[in-house]
């Protein structure tokens, strides 16, 4: 939410840094970074709504998607949400990675102020699990496709594996290692 009370939401990756401690990396130019720098507070909405994911990625959600809370951007259909107060905003050294050539970004460190579960089984999505599912689907097709398509699947595996090592829990990382070993046994050259 902006300092002027304009609510917005966008998918971001949150990393658990310890008990009641969260962190994230936000790139310069995003509304989220601007708002967090201005207000030093934000809400992590946990939702499974694919329409909200798309709309909040390509633009902003309609005001009707948010609750009537005056000072927080809480989604009406959130499975759960976490209110965070920023403890530190640190500019990262410029990096060149798969996302951007200049890598101008900030690391946001936060304390969890409150956790609200609207549904008893609320669980955050992790893109690593979906990347694993993509890799598993591609794996089942490796013996059925052309060499060109195999190379594409291997490239996707390598990229997904790199990402999973950064954003996923140990179970997903271990699952990718098992899949990698099986691919190597089949004669595929994976990283």
Residue ranges and their predicted role:
Residues 1-81, 85-191:
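Basic, polyanion-binding surface patches
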């Amino acid at each position: 939410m902006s300092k002027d009370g304009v609510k917005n939401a966008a998918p971001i990756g949150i990393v658990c840094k310890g008990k009641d401690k969260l962190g994230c990396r936000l790139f310069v130019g995003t509304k989220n970074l601007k708002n967090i720098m201005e207000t030093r507070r934000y809400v992590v909405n946990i939702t499974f709504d694919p329409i909200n994911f798309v709309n909040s990625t390509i633009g902003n959600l309609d005001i009707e998607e948010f609750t009537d809370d005056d000072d927080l951007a809480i989604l009406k259909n959130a499975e759960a949400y976490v209110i965070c107060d920023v403890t530190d905003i640190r500019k990262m050294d410029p990096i060149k990675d798969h996302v951007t050539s200049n890598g101008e970004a900030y690391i946001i460190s936060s304390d969890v102020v409150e956790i609200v579960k609207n549904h008893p089984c609320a669980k955050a999505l992790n893109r690593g699990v979906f990347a694993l599912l993509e890799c598993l689907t591609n794996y089942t097709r490796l013996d059925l496709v052309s060499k060109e398509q195999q190379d594409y699947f291997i490239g996707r595996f390598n990229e997904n594996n790199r990402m999973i090592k950064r954003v996923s829990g140990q179970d997903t990382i271990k699952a990718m290692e098992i899949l990698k070993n099986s691919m190597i046994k089949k004669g595929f050259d994976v990283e």
